[in-house]
Design a protein with these regions (language model features):
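Active-site beta->alpha N-cap acidic-glycine motif
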Residues: 8-134
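Metal-dependent polysaccharide deacetylase catalytic core of the NodB/CE4 family, i.e.
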Residues: 83-199, 223, 279-291
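C-terminal domain-boundary segment and adjacent tail
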Residues: 20-25, 32, 77, 213-217, ...
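Active-site-adjacent pocket scaffolds in enzyme catalytic domains
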Residues: 2-34, 117-126, 130-136, 182-294
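Active-site metal-binding loops of divalent metal-dependent hydrolases
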Residues: 45-47, 147, 283, 324
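Generic enzyme active-site microenvironment
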Residues: 43-44, 144, 280, 321
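Well-ordered, non-membrane alpha-helical segments in soluble/globular domains
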Residues: 58-71, 121-131, 166-174, 260-264, ...
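Loop/turn elements at helix/coil->beta-strand transitions in domains of secreted/extracellular proteins
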Residues: 77-83, 138-142, 185-187, 210-212, ...
């Protein structure tokens, strides 16, 4: 007999007093379908036309890289779904400063790009129709939003929205969505902000532009329990294992809680607690000497195959194999599908 996570009254409101107190006004949401004890979703960040090669990446190369590994997993596990967090016009070359002298000068370093960046338009999705078509034909895959350029001035290069006002965030999101409109690439109304960081300006802009959910927090260290809260990367104070409403119920938050360095027992503990096992990967393993521990290479692919197989054997059909977009749809508008064609509003 399948088990469900303990029910929470729909009207419950939780207000946590932190530096993000306005963002953290929200509460639990009834998110699991009847008959499911827990859920699993998988997402990949930093998807863009230059994955593995900032100058060029042919479709044949895509089949051999991260997206090839994803396809292998999708073939092996028919219930698996994936969210590809895709950047509209990727400009990042290095995620860490390479202009080391400038990076040591206070004030000045905050006003300059501390690494070379790609010219605007180099990796614009609409300039790479073969890449867009490749994404469109992937089975059981949805597209999520992952920023406009994935860069900012200052030492924290990927954190694109960190210093922007609400108006600047709105303009950036609108330009990002306009690029998706050029391609006709459908996307789910969810954002994974580059560098995980979220601000009140960004949440206000998300609400204004029709984005319904955000995946800001990542925590791979906090022990699993029904009361555990995220306290690592990005937004702190949100639930570690349950989808949760924030911003007065206007946005849904989803925490990433498992990656390549996590033990299988962590995945099992999340399922036992009736939570959402939100597995994260990055599209590129090594960039400019920086290695992503969760880069989706063959080793990580094989580990995920082991994790998925073990969970299938232990829990069978009691797990909801879902996606961040499907959870957003269920929680924020009650429909089975909430995929937007770029340029539309829900």
């Amino acid at each position: 007999m399948s088990k469900k996570s303990p029910p929470t009254p729909k009207g419950l409101t939780i207000i946590r007093r932190t530096g993000n107190s306005k963002i953290l006004t929200g509460g639990r949401v009834d998110w699991l379908p009847e008959g499911k004890r827990a859920a699993l979703c998988f997402s990949i960040d930093d998807v863009h036309p230059g994955m593995g090669n900032q100058e060029h990446n042919a479709v044949g190369e895509l089949n051999q890289g991260c997206l090839g590994h994803l396809r292998w997993l999708l073939d092996r596990h028919p219930h698996l779904r994936a969210t590809l967090f895709t950047t509209a016009d990727w400009r990042e070359i290095s995620p860490v400063p390479t202009k080391r002298l400038l990076a040591r000068i206070p004030y000045l370093r905050e006003r300059l790009y501390l690494t070379p960046i790609l010219p605007i338009g180099t990796m614009r999705l609409s300039n790479h129709p073969e890449f867009v078509q490749f994404l469109k034909q992937l089975p059981r895959v949805e597209i999520g939003l992952h920023g406009l350029h994935h860069v900012q001035r200052g030492p924290r290069i990927p954190i694109e929205f960190q210093k922007l006002s609400a108006a600047e965030c709105t303009r950036t999101l609108q330009e990002m969505i306009a690029i998706f409109a050029e391609t006709g690439l459908e996307y789910s109304p969810l954002l994974n902000p580059p560098g995980w960081e979220i601000t009140e300006s960004l949440t206000n802009a998300m609400i204004e532009t029709g984005i319904k959910s955000v995946a800001s927090a990542r925590d791979l260290r906090t022990p699993i329990s029904s009361a555990a809260i995220a306290n690592m990367s990005g937004l702190k104070g949100v639930s570690l294992i349950y989808p949760e409403l924030i911003c007065g119920g206007q946005l849904l938050h989803l925490t990433s809680n498992f990656q390549a360095t996590s033990p299988v027992d962590r995945a099992v503990a999340i399922i036992k607690n009736g939570g959402l096992l939100a597995i994260k990967a990055h599209a590129m393993k090594t960039v400019s000497g920086h290695t992503a521990l969760d880069g989706l290479d063959e080793l990580y692919r094989n580990y995920l195959d082991l994790v998925f197989t073990r969970l299938e054997d232990m829990y069978g059909d009691s797990i909801w194999w879902t996606s961040m977009g499907e959870i957003t749809s269920r929680c924020m508008n009650g429909s089975n599908q909430m995929v937007l064609k770029a340029g539309t509003r829900s």
